[in-house]
Amino acid sequence: MKLLFFDDFKLGVLKDDNVVGITHLVENIPHTHPQQLIAGLIENFEDYRDKIEHGVKGSDGYPITGVRVRPPLPKPANIDCMAVNYMEDGTRDEPAPINVFQKTPHAIIGPDDTMV
């Protein structure tokens, strides 16, 4: 099951090439913003799994091309990035030096969003 936020941070599940909204199925999770909603769902996922699976089966949802997919964590606390963290196609004798940098949490965008 692939969870995602879409449009105005509605919670959804990816079903084939469609997005099925599930916010109404988890609205009793105490939250004032999307970050709390997804954290509450993850924390109590086993309590909601059957309800979500049943709700997703009964809906076709919206084509993913017709919704705006949003960042998975609307307000992350910290983002640590690795510039190189793998052996490039087997052509290196040894791993590249570790190059770590941080990004501001306000720099998170969703797929196909414009970076400013």
Annotate each predicted stretch with a short phrase.
Residues M1-I98:
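N-terminal non-catalytic cap/leader segment that marks the start of a structured domain
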Residues E94-P111:
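Structural signature of FAD isoalloxazine-binding scaffolds in flavoprotein oxidoreductases
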Residues D113-V116:
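Glycine-rich, charged/polar anion/phosphate-binding loops
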